[in-house]
Amino acid sequence: MPVEILMPALSPTMEEGTLSKWLKNEGDKVSSGDVIAEIETDKATMEVEAVDEGTIGKLLIAAGTEGVKVNTPIAVLLQDGEAASDIDSMKTEAPKAETPKPAAAEAPAASAAPVAAQPKADVPSDPAIPAGTEMATMTVREALRDAMAEEMRANEDVFVMGEEVAEYQGAYKVTQGLLQEFGARRVVDTPITEHGFAGVGVGAAMTGLRPIVEFMTFNFAMQAIDQIINSAAKTLYMSGGQMGAPIVFRGPSGAAARVAAQHSQCYAAWYSHIPGLKVVMPYTAADAKGLLKAAIRDPNPVIFLENEILYGQSFEVPKLDDFVLPIGKARIHRTGKDATLVSFGIGMTYAIKAAAELEAQGIDVEIIDLRTIRPMDLPTVIESVKKTGRLVTVEEGYPQSSVGTEIATRVMQQAFDYLDAPILTIAGKDVPMPYAANLEKLALPNVAEVVDAVKAVCYK
């Protein structure tokens, strides 16, 4: 679906400004972070950046226009495979709902009694997609939005809150259209106070609601880590099973494009250390939708990690009435016999490209997409290792105490006799993420490293 680029605010009190000039034209291709325009007030000038990669489909506001209201659509960004004609269909594809009446931006009223702790989520085993199922091509962004919308329609206790989720429709447009359908009572804009609104979410969960707390980036969640770990994760244990916290903390994690050290950290390993949390990091749009629906229904707190670069990537998603995937079950993305590659999230892009290169060299690689970091589906990994005898892990996070080293440790403990070579782990470099593009590239894993690692364990 085409993405609207909105007029941003230079300050919390700004209501309108001047779109002084466009730096991109209709038809130009842009990447996330590219400067596309300049806006100004009588006090300051600011650059407007593209929220995702794509093509400028239409400029809605002419350069030099004064008095442009904040959050007014100023341009439309087309995703891969979309054409200018798709812009005209945006209105017909928008959620069919009445415009919400003005309401105070507050969470739904909570039930008086604490929610009873539930040890298991009501989610089916990993469903096989029935033969002949109609598939729809959609981006990860759209799949996440649809998952939230479906669960909000099914359960009035579900609501979403966070920075820019309502009026601005999400920093990355993941919540696009939700305010129009569900209103300000269930799509709640918050101040930039992560510790505060995370605590509000945990409290709402303790009293029976099912909050979805969006962080603009999981790097900002470090401000709220006390609420996530000490309040959400430990409540079930500390209450002796009398009270739970069914809450989802979601948002982008990991490197994007030149957002430097404080905005590029992968939190998969960080949160996987914590008893009481579930940690999910999907790669495909189908997994993003099915796992987010499961996370919203889960009686436990779930860390749902996304990736800014994957938001605009398109995948096939089954058109089923209620497509839900089980948390804690890995997926075999590709079968093979010579070596096992294990990854998750954006790390899958390296694994898939490496497998294609290795196939051309006569090496048949099996790829496992973990999908869930905690609880980890180690049996699927071990069964693959029993077949291939070789294991390489791939991720973008830091190398020390990484997801890969955890997998390596447990495979060594439980399947050592099946290994024909040492386990190798590929991860980001052990440095804060540089801002310079050339250095950022060096700090991240690459396909060549994965290819070399697989060849090494295969003694090629």
Swiss-Prot record:
Keyword presence, Transferase: no
EC number: 1.2.4.1
Record's keyword terms, sorted: Lipoyl, Oxidoreductase, Pyruvate, Thiamine pyrophosphate
InterPro entries listed in its UniProt record: 2-oxoA_DH_lipoyl-BS, Biotin_lipoyl, PDHB_mito-type, Single_hybrid_motif, THDP-binding, Transketo_C/PFOR_II, Transketolase-like_Pyr-bd, Transketolase_C
Annotated spans, Disordered: 91-131
UniProt xrefs under Pfam families: Biotin_lipoyl, Transket_pyr, Transketolase_C
Keyword Oxidoreductase: yes
Cofactor dependence: (R)-lipoate; thiamine diphosphate
UniProt name for this protein: Pyruvate dehydrogenase E1 component subunit beta
Organism listed in the record: Rhizobium meliloti (strain 1021) (Ensifer meliloti)
Gene label: pdhB
